[in-house]
């Protein structure tokens, strides 16, 4: 029997947004998630704006949701936010069939993925007085 799943606790300076059941393979989604990991949110939004990947628009909406959660629910400063974590999970796989020659059929698998983005407020290191 498996252990009970424990939810990840957010710290006081963090906020998150989750997009579930996205119609893209986890491998392709992870390419876009790796693009924004560790970057400041304004830089990450710019990267997603000009990315040519199809799923980049959905990732951008999820990041904007995480920023809005940080501002409205957790009272964090938007200018000091960085993308602390952006991780991808595997979801369901739809099975479809494709008719082939001689009366045969082959299976087509259409994968789905989950995306979780955690933004964290950081203090500026060298502030000028």
Swiss-Prot record:
Keyword Metal-binding listed: no
InterPro entries: Ribosomal_uL22, Ribosomal_uL22_bac/chlpt-type, Ribosomal_uL22_bac/org-type, Ribosomal_uL22_CS, Ribosomal_uL22_sf
Pfam families in alphabetical order: Ribosomal_L22
One GO molecular-function entry: structural constituent of ribosome
Keyword Secreted applies: no
Range of residues in the leader sequence: none
Any one GO CC term of the record: cytosolic large ribosomal subunit
NCBIfam families the UniProt entry points to: rplV_bact (TIGR01044)
Family to which the UniProt record says this protein belongs: Belongs to the universal ribosomal protein uL22 family.
Subunit composition and interactions: Part of the 50S ribosomal subunit.
Described purpose of this protein according to its UniProt entry: This protein binds specifically to 23S rRNA; its binding is stimulated by other ribosomal proteins, e.g. L4, L17, and L20. It is important during the early stages of 50S assembly. It makes multiple contacts with different domains of the 23S rRNA in the assembled 50S subunit and ribosome. The globular domain of the protein is located near the polypeptide exit tunnel on the outside of the subunit, while an extended beta-hairpin is found that lines the wall of the exit tunnel in the center of the 70S ribosome.
Name of this protein: Large ribosomal subunit protein uL22
Protein source organism: Agrobacterium fabrum (strain C58 / ATCC 33970) (Agrobacterium tumefaciens (strain C58))
Origin organism lineage: Bacteria, Pseudomonadati, Pseudomonadota, Alphaproteobacteria, Hyphomicrobiales
Gene that encodes the chain: rplV
